[in-house]
Amino acid sequence: MVCSITLLKVRSKRHLLSYLGVVGVGIAGLCIYRSVWGSRPFLERLARADSLIAQERKGAALRGLARMVGHARESSQYLSIAKRQMELSASAAALRTLQRGIRRSADDGRLAALVIHLLLREARFEEAISYVPRVVHKGYESIGAEALIKAALIGSRTGGDSPSRGSFHSERAEHVPEEPVEFSQVQGGRDQAHVTAFPLDRGEEQFRVEPSPPIRHTTGIALARIAPALWLAAFGVTGMHAFLQNAACAYARVGELHAAFRLYSRILGTEAPENTAFWATVAYDAGQFSLVFELLPISLARADLFGTYSAASTHARTHLLLAADAAFDGGDRARARAFWYAYVDRFPGTSTHALYNLALTAPHAQERVRMLAQCVEGDKTYYPAVACYARESIAFRAAHRQRDSVTELLSERGVYSVQMEQEHFLSPHFPVEARSLLAELAQEAMHGRADVRFALEYFRFCYPAQKRLQGSRGALWQLLEVFPVDTQVRRYARWFFFRIGEYESAFGLSDAGGGPEDAFYRALAAASRTGRVESILGGLVEATRAVEARSAAFANIAIVLERMGKKTAAAEHFVLAADEATRESVRQLQKEAGEGEAEEHPRARPAAGKAQRWREWYQRAGQLLQQQGKTVAARALLQRAQAR
């Protein structure tokens, strides 16, 4: 009995194993069948749908295709169904099919590209751009670019902000600002310099060679935050240079200037760029000056071909000024002046900037005044030229008054030495009377029709420049009454009152636009009320944040520390003040004045005046260290003061 039971168990196990083996073989066979023949029912249904389409049985074909969607497993199957639905003009059904396919195969760019195509056909731009990230780096970037561009076009026409969502950001584009990008618009590293004068020594102004304005060739189309990859894809498909230029803009806007410049190499060597001035600007911003000069003949030739009022002429004007900037920045002043002269000859009606730059780089006073006079006669509202012209007039009169009596007597008798003849023939001629010009412009400014700086310049011409204080307080208070909240007027008035010892009036103007200088004057006012000199230190430290006031702030901190008996700290701050002033003015002289021109160049005079301050500050620091017994450091500073 026991033996029979054991035998039964063994047989049961054998039957079970045999059964499991048969089931396993069946499952494997089914898997192989599905992998090899599983698509045959789908292909048969697809053939049936094609037959119905051929028989023009549209309704039956669409119903069959709709049922097939539930049996589709691969992205190619969804594409096959959607293609036939589109052929039957059932775009809505095709869109649903593709969207279902995307949910199943999210990484297939073909499905998203076809969805974008369908949505663009129906002008559903906001929905289309939401699919753009799915086509990038999938070989379908061009359709994504088309969606973003069309959305931006519609947004600009309707006053909207499209694309408002879904604008694709690549690894670079995620830093692109919210402002719109415009067709062929350069956003380079240089600011447009409408104002070229800035405060120097609290009331004096220094002038600089003016850079050309950045190129702006726009069509008024707001194209926001589109990634460079999309622009490049559009360029690859169409070959249109505008797309390549906008890719360069996208890189430039996030500071990738060299990446923007490298895009120029995509233009074939046998093909000239459509906008040479654009690529010249990109090259300038990337520091590649050679391309600026290389493309200039093309810009000028196109301007000659298409005429004065063409876009090519506008590009040529910008390009010529840009070439002058590149030459000047490269240290070739003669070449820069040649470009500015060429600009004046070619475009005489728009040559204010070029004439002004020629004046600042002129080799002698006569040439400088002649260029300034042309500039003023062409545009008397251009403040930098008018201010320089007036100051040259003041300097010439002051020099003429200093002539000795013997020279005056000889000139009256008609007797001239070689030096007198040279001075006579090189003396500047002022065709416009500076005082009357400034008086006219000051009146215009008082009525809000001209730059307020003309009113300040006229005040400076009448009082500080003439070393005359009588009536100056009343004239300045009159300006403050006309311009009670103007920052420039309040700052100048505060400086002037301090200069003449009207401290209470200066303290009353402590609020002049905010910033470190206001903190400095508030600290002075507090110190004058409390009598504690150390209370001024906080304001002075804050004033060091302003670049133009840094050397003066360090010097004032040193003076306060010396009064407090902290001589070592005072010496350190005197050195900081001298070093800061040295860096600022030496750079200025090296760039703006060539060898042998220091006395002639308008920027050399204030810089030369600062040299005395350097010596005084280094010398005072050395004296303080000597008092502390630090003879080695003191001797080094005193030698530095003598060397400069």
Swiss-Prot record:
InterPro entries: TPR-like_helical_dom_sf. One of its GO terms (cellular component) is membrane. Its main location: membrane. The chain crosses the membrane at residues 16-38. It is found in: Membrane. Residues 586-613 are annotated as: Disordered. Gene3D superfamilies: Tetratricopeptide repeat domain. It is a single-pass membrane protein. Residues 586-603 have a biased composition (Basic and acidic residues). This is Uncharacterized protein TP_1014. It comes from Treponema pallidum (strain Nichols).
